[in-house]
Amino acid sequence: MSYQQQQCKQPCQPPPVCPAPKCPEPCPPPKCPEPCPPSKCPQSCPPQQCQQKCPPVTPSPPCQPKCPPKSK
């Protein structure tokens, strides 16, 4: 017996109307439990400095006459 003949022996019934599947509630977009802070270094990184600090610039000494004063 073919599949169609077996089906015809049963009384014809309209197929049950399947409701469209829905979420029980509208699904919220996924979020972090808390607002995520921007990633940071574990320690705050100090600004990079020269390994040796330059000594403070001293003003050039005032000009002196090259010749020492003549002593008699």
Swiss-Prot record:
Chain segments carrying region Disordered: 53-72
> Which keywords does this Swiss-Prot/TrEMBL entry list?
Cytoplasm, Keratinization, Repeat
Chain residue ranges for the region called 3 X 9 AA tandem repeats of [PS]-K-C-P-[EQ]-[PS]-C-P-P:
21-47
Give its localization. Cytoplasm
Composition bias of kind Pro residues appears in 56-72
Kindly summarize what the UniProt induction comment says about this protein's expression: During squamous differentiation of epidermal keratinocytes.
Which cysteine residues pair off into disulfide bonds? none
Query: What ranges cover the sequence repeats?
Result: 21-29, 30-38, 39-47
BP GO terms, sorted: epidermis development; keratinization; keratinocyte differentiation
One Gene Ontology CC term in the entry: cornified envelope
Q: According to the lineage, what is the superkingdom?
A: Eukaryota
* Task of the protein: Cross-linked envelope protein of keratinocytes. It is a keratinocyte protein that first appears in the cell cytosol, but ultimately becomes cross-linked to membrane proteins by transglutaminase. All that results in the formation of an insoluble envelope beneath the plasma membrane.
Say which family it is in. Belongs to the cornifin (SPRR) family.
Q: What is this protein called?
A: Small proline-rich protein 2F
Species whose genome carries this gene: Homo sapiens (Human)
Gene from which the chain derives = SPRR2F
